[in-house]
Curated annotation (Swiss-Prot):
Signal peptide: 1-62
Keyword vocabulary terms for this entry: Cleavage on pair of basic residues, Coiled coil, Disulfide bond, Fusion of virus membrane with host cell membrane, Fusion of virus membrane with host membrane, Glycoprotein, Host cell membrane, Host membrane, Host-virus interaction, Lipoprotein, Membrane, Palmitate, Signal, Transmembrane, Transmembrane helix, Viral attachment to host cell, Viral attachment to host entry receptor, Viral envelope protein, Viral penetration into host cytoplasm, Virion, Virus entry into host cell
Region of interest (Immunosuppression), residue spans: 474-490
Record lineage: Viruses, Riboviria, Pararnavirae, Artverviricota, Revtraviricetes
Record-given protein name: Envelope glycoprotein gp95
Species: Avian leukosis virus subgroup A (isolate RSA)
Amino acid sequence: MEAVIKAFLTGYPGKTSKKDSKEKPLATSKKDPEKTPLLPTRVNYILIIGVLVLCEVTGVRADVHLLEQPGNLWITWANRTGQTDFCLSTQSATSPFQTCLIGIPSPISEGDFKGYVSDNCTTLGTDRLVSSADFTGGPDNSTTLTYRKVSCLLLKLNVSMWDEPHELQLLGSQSLPNITNIAQISGITGGCVGFRPQGVPWYLGWSRQEATRFLLRHPSFSKSTEPFTVVTADRHNLFMGSEYCGAYGYRFWNMYNCSQVGRQYRCGNARSPRPGLPEIQCTRRGGKWVNQSQEINESEPFSFTVNCTASSLGNASGCCGKAGTILPGKWVDSTQGSFTKPKALPPAIFLICGDRAWQGIPSRPVGGPCYLGKLTMLAPKHTDILKVLVNSSRTGIRRKRSTSHLDDTCSDEVQLWGPTARIFASILAPGVARAQALREIERLACWSVKQANLTTSFLGDLLDDVTSIRHAVLQNRAAIDFLLLAHGHGCEDVAGMCCFNLSDHSESIQKKFQLMKEHVNKIGVDSDPIGSWLRGLFGGIGEWAVHLLKGLLLGLVVILLLVVCLPCLLQIVCGNIRKMINNSISYHTEYKKLQKACGQPESRIV
């Protein structure tokens, strides 16, 4: 122990023995500063004591070596995000978490947020899509868009995170759908929300740099000394407006309650009048203007007629129907108490903002637009496609015949006849030749099935070995690249680091392997031809119905046979009876003739 302390204090290790450990330290030369003992002086003692006191006052603990070390990086990331499919991007060596994922909107239910919110969202309010509530006797067109539920759930999040959620760079995200059918609105329509401090004149067209510059130049708007997290997309011009958040394709009629003040017009609760007629303000943006007290005749999304009247209208009032409006969203106040710390989202649910995503809500977010959704691969896996096909509609499925596979006990010894045997058998016994041919075909089918089963089993074992080796290579390569990046070595330091080509024919191999297995199953024995015919005739009927129809068909065949054969049987029986009677009568006549010829009386005949 003393040797270790000595090596630590002197700055260089050395071999020491028990005898050397008892001796005093060797005197070092002042000319060699590297071998000068690092023994603390009086000034160093004062500095060490001051640092310890400062750490005790500020609450900084010195036992950081007792913190639990993190486990596997990718397993930790998958457990925290609920996402198991991801890939590393080698386009930038300094961004190892840049993924090959895209964001997709997903229906949000309160059951998914159980345990993550403090209360339920019971009263969400409604949105009107056809006309505002100012009209007297207007059409009832109220609905609840998704942004109300999203904003309510975000404000009620109560599970805080220790650190800020990791930002994921996405390839992009899917836009929200437009409303093309007012009777069928999906559960993801209108789910965009934005974040801003209360009262800040925010604009969705701002980039990340513009938003950051505004917050730095106007600190009074933020009303907080803590920094904000800008969640606007990097390529914000691709993820904004109706192209990203969706739009309402029909006209929305709104009441313009305007009064003329000199040569200007004041509309609604405007602070100051503006120049220009309200009609021009409406038609300049593609709207349709109707003066007050006139009728509005609309045919889409459904036909309705309503008067452009309301209470307490000004002398320049009217109705404006604008088309192609962006679906309404909501600005969430990012200075509220629920956003002062990063909040956790349920697994597999992400805050998606264009080409950026978080598995949680960063502290004091600003910007947008964003929605809650999930992540998926740009090119889905073969298993994902199979799941979609299985869960899709099952209409138009062809019914297979009730053939049974050849078992392992079938005979695979194929013994073909020679030319001489075939010629004599075909001339002398054609039936025997046909029976022999059918038997050999059956044995040949059995041999083919067994050979194909052995081949597929062999290829399956090889495929498992190749897959395990591939996984091991990819894991080792990811670990090596990440360790090099963690130590500051990029693509320019290590040759071939960012160019790692590993051929992937697993999908093609899996398809061919599956085709081989399906091809083997095509050889079978039709054990129930009548049942197969009935299933093909009547479609998807159950087995009990097949057995019932087979019984009825058998009874019908028996009845038909009786109807056809019974007259013949009756005719044969009647003929035999008639023949017996005729024979009996003929015998009796001959007997009488013989009796008269012999002159014997009839009474003496016994």
